[in-house]
């Protein structure tokens, strides 16, 4: 555990230029007045301020305490003060942790892996409870993810449970687990918030079952289930006042098939959705009789209601609506919503969605409400006024935290905050590498996106002056000054530019092709390029495997300070397409109990404004989607990788029948049904390139043929399938992907659309490898006649910068608070185009059908990794243990060369 004392407000003043604009002088070109000093920095940092890969800087108030095994990706979820008022209990993804409130020291930790019955289990989303019963302190919380065997050896066939632990003042120990079975079609019951209550001398707990859409009441002494009754869709939080229990439902009421409103798929059912975006359109609070479980009423609130608390006098209930950026105020006596408190950081200026309130606390006087705004990285302080009528309030200010505050505990005169994302994935691995060209060996650092500690912050309650200063600090840390770029009106008679300075001014481009690939870090691919800041010893897919991407970086530009904003594909595709993630995604990180939505098939994942194609359609632009945001269907028993590859060589692919589906009704007309999927590795990326090039040529041949204004393409095979013998070797699959990129670029550069088309290429995330500067650093390419810079661009960009640039080109406003504060990629373009240059792809140096060897020919590590490739199903995007896949890729490319294992954990973790 480390204690990091962060810079004070006075010190912060001295570094103000670090996070503010370099100049406010009007009249500069290419957006120079909107640049900040962070734009020249990398993400590497050993202390605050920390630059995050989504236009935010962390410089939190108070003292932050880190904990957790650095070989994992740790997240603190929720916290509660124990009844002794001396101990803080934190629920984290891998167990529970006890802290001394006076010393702030970790005094005990219980983890699931310490008990063989629970090895591999994880805590659910939030909601831990502590209570004294018969002079003993008991703790209850929800967990899931593994079938458990209880006393007597009976397999419960339940992969969800409410955990009960005991605290003796020094150590915590597990008492028992209460199992809950999934109810079809759900695959996991998912107990989330648990409330322990004493009633008539007996100890009970109430728990919402997020997967089963139920609430359950259990008597602890004999484990008897008093009732299990229905709620709305995906219940999350619970509060009890008198005889009523109030339950927040992430996805609102259970749909009624007779009302004609649009619904779409979520895990294990349907939810009401907005037909324009595919996102959830309702959230609700169920009210039940706490003694019988019988439903009394269901109240409409905002979108994605999560945290729920009551005032100390029990007159009012406050509900945080994560996707609406406001708090619903419910009057308990009338059971109606009487007000909404808008808590977004930028709400008073312009209602950009994205602040994401998801945690609540209220002081004993009932005068102050504290709201954890996840994507603001701040606590919003609301003055409820002494009148306390639920209608009079003011926003007093904001307090800076670490990334994604998720829970708040009040302890005397301080706030204790769980920071779900801490400072990001910054755990440093120092290990020995043979750095090419260096003698002797030296220790170097390496980062991976799934290595980070959990964090909690202890923040003294600010006075008025401190809160005013904190508020200004939060605005600076969140790049508020860049909102000016979104608010300036377009000027008349402005000549077209590659990236217009103002939204609505003309661009030289009419068409944007956006290609999303899978999971590589910068050093993995470009680490061998002397033009950038690379590390050759981490480069496993260098020039011999990816000659086209290397050549494109030389012919156009190399970005060596470009970052993925997320850490896995389930996050990455949302960052790449929506420029933000929702609370549903953040609360699911690493556990993914309900879904792993990298192909965007879960309506609960989307924010209310949707994704970039919604933005384009809303503003009259044409859209075409190739393999993104869809599921791909065909007869998998008949077609495998080798069969389809051979059919392509023989010219018989016409026999291959398939189709794509999406939960988003609005984009169905624009989803290509000839493009062969975007998440299935049985499909060679050459087949995908073939289809796009065919369609391009058909459009080119028509006098009125036009490309869509926005084209979004999934090109996934650089993900690889490990060393599964049914698939090519990792280097062959990456080479397949590389050749497809080269062929697509060639086709566009030689077409009649070349002069007004720009191609953006990004990885969805950077999880499957190592980088020596940042775990988020990845490969990105920009290709157009106006991008023939033939130089290295070192500006700090990320996926939200890329999305903002596409919006700026197409004349689209930002979708949310993240892309609204992103820096467009002005540095990647010139006003002097090169229309003569046409790209010629470089033939693959690795045979695309170089198959992984069969098991009978293997031994040692090769045999081990063969078996794990099959066991964990790496042929499906991001299925299985990411660290094991990283080891497999390293071994496949580097043989017995030392793996950066210190922070990856011991090799026996693979087993």
Regions inferred by a protein language model and the residue ranges of each:
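A generic structural signal for short coil/turn motifs at secondary-structure boundaries
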Residues: 16, 148-152, 227, 297, ...
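A generic structural signal for short, non-catalytic loop/turn and secondary-structure boundary residues
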Residues: 10-14, 58-60, 449, 569, ...
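N-terminal pro-sequences and low-complexity stem/linker regions of secreted or lumenal proteins
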Residues: 468-911
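Bacterial Sec-dependent N-terminal signal peptides
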Residues: 1-28
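Residues in and immediately flanking transmembrane alpha helices
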Residues: 15-16, 262, 531, 777
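Predominantly soluble domains enriched in secretory-pathway, periplasmic, or organellar proteins
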Residues: 23-496
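Disordered, low-complexity tails and leader-like regions
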Residues: 4-8, 13-14, 55, 287, ...
């Amino acid at each position: 555990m480390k204690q990091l004392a962060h810079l004070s407000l006075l010190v912060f003043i001295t570094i103000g230029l670090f996070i503010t604009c370099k100049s406010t002088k009007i009249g500069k070109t290419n957006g120079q007045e909107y640049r900040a000093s962070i734009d020249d920095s990398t993400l590497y940092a050993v202390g605050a301020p920390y630059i995050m890969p989504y236009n935010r800087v962390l410089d939190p108030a108070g003292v932050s305490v880190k904990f957790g095994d650095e070989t994992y990706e740790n997240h603190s979820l929720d916290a509660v003060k124990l009844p002794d008022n001396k101990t803080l209990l934190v629920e984290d993804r891998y167990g529970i942790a006890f802290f001394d409130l006076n010393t702030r020291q970790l005094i005990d930790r219980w983890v699931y892996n310490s008990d063989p019955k629970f090895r591999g289990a994880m805590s659910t989303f939030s909601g831990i409870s502590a209570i004294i019963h018969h002079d003993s302190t008991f703790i209850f919380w929800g967990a899931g993810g593994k079938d458990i065997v209880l006393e007597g050896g009976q397999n419960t066939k339940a992969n969800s449970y409410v955990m009960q632990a005991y605290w003796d003042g020094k150590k915590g120990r597990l008492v028992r687990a209460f199992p809950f079975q999934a109810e079809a079609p759900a695959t996991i019951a998912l107990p989330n918030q648990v409330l322990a209550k004493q009633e008539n001398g007996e100890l009970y707990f109430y728990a919402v079952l997020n997967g089963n859409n139920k609430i359950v009441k259990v008597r602890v002494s004999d484990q008897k289930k008093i009732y299990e009754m229905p709620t709305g869709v995906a219940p999350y939080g619970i509060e009890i006042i008198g005889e009523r229990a109030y339950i927040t439902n992430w996805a609102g009421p259970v749909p009624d098939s007779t009302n004609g409103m649009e619904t779409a798929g979520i895990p294990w059912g349907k939810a009401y959705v907005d037909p324009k975006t595919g996102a959830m359109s309702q959230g609700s609070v169920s009210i039940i009789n706490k003694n019988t479980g019988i439903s009394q009423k269901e109240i409409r609130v905002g979108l994605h209601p999560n945290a729920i608390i009551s005032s100390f006098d029990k007159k009012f209930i406050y509900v945080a609506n994560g996707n609406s950026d406001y708090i619903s105020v419910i009057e308990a006596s009338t059971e109606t919503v009487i007000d909404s408190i808008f808590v977004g950081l930028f709400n008073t200026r312009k209602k950009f969605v994205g602040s994401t309130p998801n945690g609540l606390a209220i002081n004993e006087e009932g005068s102050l409400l504290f709201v954890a705004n996840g994507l603001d990285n701040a606590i919003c302080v609301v003055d409820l006024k002494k009148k306390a009528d639920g209608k009079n309030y003011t926003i007093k200010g904001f307090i800076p935290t670490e990334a994604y505050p998720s829970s708040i505990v009040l302890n005397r005169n301080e706030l204790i905050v769980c920071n779900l994302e801490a400072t990001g994935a910054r755990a440093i691995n120092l290990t020995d590498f043979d750095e090419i060209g260096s003698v002797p060996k030296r220790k170097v650092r390496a980062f991976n996106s799934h290595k980070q500690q959990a964090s909690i912050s202890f923040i003294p309650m600010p006075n008025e002056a401190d809160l005013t200063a904190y508020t200004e600090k939060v605005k600076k840390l969140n790049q508020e000054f860049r909102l000016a770029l979104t608010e300036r009106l377009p000027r008349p008679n402005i000549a077209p530019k590659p990236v217009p300075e103002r939204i609505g001014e003309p661009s030289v481009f009419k068409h944007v092709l956006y290609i999303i690939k899978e999971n590589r870090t910068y050093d993995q691919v470009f680490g061998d390029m002397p033009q950038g800041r690379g590390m050759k010893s981490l480069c496993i897919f260098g020039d011999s495997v990816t000659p086209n991407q290397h050549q494109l970086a030389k012919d156009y530009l190399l970005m060596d300070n470009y970052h993925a904003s997320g850490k896995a594909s389930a996050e990455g595709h949302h960052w790449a397409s929506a420029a933000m993630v929702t609370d549903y995604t953040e609360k699911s990180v690493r556990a993914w109990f309900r879904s792993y939505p990298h192909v965007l098939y879960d309506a609960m994942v989307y924010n209310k404004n949707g994704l970039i194609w919604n933005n384009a359609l809303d503003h009259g632009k044409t859209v075409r989607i190739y393999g993104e945001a869809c599921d791909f269907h065909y007869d998998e028993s008949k077609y495998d990788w080798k069969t389809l590859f051979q059919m392509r060589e023989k010219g018989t692919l016409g026999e291959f029948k398939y189709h794509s589906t999406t939960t988003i009704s609005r984009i169905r007309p624009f989803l290509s049904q000839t493009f062969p999927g975007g998440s299935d590795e049985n499909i060679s990326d050459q087949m995908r390139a073939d289809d796009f090039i065919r369609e391009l040529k058909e459009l080119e041949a028509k006098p009125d043929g036009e490309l869509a204004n926005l084209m979004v393409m999934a090109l996934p095979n650089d993900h690889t399938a490990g060393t599964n013998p049914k698939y090519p070797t990792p280097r062959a699959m990456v080479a397949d992907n590389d050749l497809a990129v080269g062929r697509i670029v060639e086709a566009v550069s030689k077409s009649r659309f070349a002069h007004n088309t720009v191609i953006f290429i990004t990885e969805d995330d950077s999880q499957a490898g190592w980088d020596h500067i940042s775990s988020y650093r990845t490969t990105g390419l920009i290709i157009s006649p106006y991008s023939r810079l033939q130089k290295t661009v070192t500006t700090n960009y990320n996926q939200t910068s890329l999305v903002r640039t596409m919006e700026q080109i197409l004349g689209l406003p930002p979708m949310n608070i993240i892309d609204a504060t992103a820096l467009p990629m002005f540095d990647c373009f010139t006003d002097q185009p090169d229309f003569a240059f046409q790209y010629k792809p470089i033939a693959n140096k690795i045979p695309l059908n170089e198959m992984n060897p069969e098991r009978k020919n293997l031994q040692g590590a090769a045999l081990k990794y063969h078996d794990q490739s099959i066991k964990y199903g790496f042929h499906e995007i991001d299925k299985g243990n990411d660290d094991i896949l990283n080891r497999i890729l390293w071994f496949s490319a580097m043989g017995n060369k030392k793996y950066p294992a210190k922070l990856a954990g011991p090799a026996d973790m693979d087993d």
